[in-house]
Amino acid sequence: MHEMSIALSVVDAITARAREEQAEKVTAIELVAGKLSGVEIESLKFCFSAAVRGTIMEDAELMVTVPLSEGLCEVCGERFAVDGYYTQCPSCGSYKVRIVSGKELSIRSITLE
């Protein structure tokens, strides 16, 4: 379950930022996890709830945004929604498709007090 290592990394990053800002509490955290990032959102939330116990973010609200996954056809330039890595362009039928969004995993925002 790599979601626990991701949750621990997020906790470490937020803890470091909270220290820099001399915050006493983290009240909200927003993550972005693309559909193609390989992250199971519910598992991440579960692991995160365990990882924050006893920290300044223990009571923080965790929000996870899942952006649309998009591909770009390198033949005709069509941009379209994708569900996986091996995708055919709906316009020209080419398989020369580059994934342009949906693989990301990042901290979008944190709210500190």
Curated annotation (Swiss-Prot):
Keyword set, alphabetical order: Metal-binding, Nickel, Zinc
GO biological process, one term: protein modification process
Entry binding sites for Zn(2+): C73, C76, C89, C92
GO molecular function, one term: nickel cation binding
The organism's place on the tree of life at top rank: Bacteria
Binding site for Ni(2+): H2
InterPro entries for the chain: Hydgase_Ni_incorp_HypA/HybF_CS, HypA/HybF
Family named by the database record: Belongs to the HypA/HybF family.
Protein name: Hydrogenase maturation factor HypA
Organism from which the protein derives: Prosthecochloris aestuarii (strain DSM 271 / SK 413)
Species classification: Bacteria, Pseudomonadati, Chlorobiota, Chlorobiia, Chlorobiales
